[in-house]
A protein has these predicted regions:
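Cys/His-rich metal-coordination motifs, chiefly Zn-binding "fingers/knuckles"
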Residues: 1-30
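Cysteine-dependent hydrolase recognition
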Residues: 31-328
Length: 328
């Protein structure tokens, strides 16, 4: 049996980090290299197992098996994740400050590149700041996971600068309505096709010029527009095996839809079923107000959650009002 060089605790076979103190286990890393599973980058898989299991209506053991399987497949891609269960140190959901203290300790010891949060803000809280960039009552505050990247809870509205080259690369997977096993299988399949982008873009007609200027950096294909394209016709335009979507539409905190625009006409361009027929794992980028808003919603009234329930493996959007230019 191997033992941790830092704290002396016994090590389980194959682990990359000491389960007692979090120290990196170099012996197991060398063993992984020898077995053809070289770890190039390291990351933290961060959650609260009891709360996550309760939300998923599974046992902690069942959830652990799912997460450990993901860790194994990620290692085959050169990423060594350490599973960190915040409930070992924090009672209940805890505060952002408490979670950052845990993550800081792991970062200082192991220098990971990635932080993958598993669970909604009810599992691992997001910080909430006063929104200094908006006069809208509905946007009086803004929630963010930025502190988990910078390890700093100070509001960006205070004017400080960030060195993002040296920050954690952070993603969050809300568990609401999601089949974790299905998501991780899609992630594994989709990651193997990163170089085979097949794209689709849809813009509100009034922003077509701006959208085309962005899209040209991704693809030489046309940008479809709404009202010409609506939620009842979009499936006819999406080609088989499309795996990269770009949307520049209106959104609302009152409804689950995304909208096009021409003049004073705002037709429904997207709903929660619009991408349910996509058969390949895909990446989605959206510039729409509340495009990534999910708190208090479910898969039937959130395009974000319905996408993640389907084949979406990465979603980039705004949880509040999105600001952009109407032309290049």
């Amino acid at each position: 049996m191997a033992f941790c060089e830092d704290c002396g605790a016994p090590l389980s076979e194959g682990v990359l980090f000491c389960e007692n103190c979090g120290a990196k286990v170099t012996e197991n890393k060398f063993a992984a290299v020898k077995a053809g599973k070289a770890v190039i980058e390291e990351g933290i898989l961060y959650t609260n197992l009891p709360l996550l299991a309760e939300s998923l209506q599974k046992t902690e053991g069942e959830v652990t098996v799912i997460l450990e399987k993901f860790i194994e497949t990620a290692q085959n891609r050169g990423i060594g994740y350490q599973l960190c269960d915040a409930s070992k140190s924090i009672a209940g959901c805890g505060s952002v400050d408490q979670h950052i203290a845990i993550i800081k300790a792991l970062v200082e010891k192991n220098h990971p590149k990635y932080l993958f949060i598993i669970g909604s803000s009810k599992i691992i809280p997001s910080i909430v700041w006063k929104n200094e960039a908006s006069d809208f009552e509905s946007d009086a505050d803004v929630s963010s996971d930025l502190p988990y990247s910078t390890l700093d809870t100070a509001s960006p509205f205070d004017g400080q600068e960030y060195d993002f080259d040296n920050c954690l690369k952070v993603g969050r997977l809300p568990e609401i309505g999601i089949d974790l096993e299905n998501y991780f299988e899609n992630l594994e399949s989709g990651c193997s096709k990163l170089e085979e982008a097949k794209t689709f873009a849809l813009s509100a007609q009034v922003w077509q010029e701006e959208s085309a200027d962005i899209y040209k950096n991704i693809s030489d294909r046309q940008v479809f527009t709404s009202p010409a394209c609506e939620n009842t016709t979009i499936t006819n335009l999406i080609e088989e095996n499309t795996n990269l979507f770009l949307f520049n539409l209106h959104g609302s905190n009152k409804t689950e839809f995304w909208y096009g625009q021409t003049g004073n006409e705002y037709p429904t361009a997207m709903d929660h079923n619009s991408l349910s027929y996509v058969t390949s794992p895909y990446f989605l980028m959206v510039e729409a107000c509340y495009g990534a808003f999910y708190e208090g919603r479910s898969c039937i009234n959130s395009i974000l959650l319905s996408a993640l329930k389907g084949k979406c493996i990465s979603f980039l959007g705004s949880s509040r009002i999105a600001f952009g230019t109407p032309c290049p």
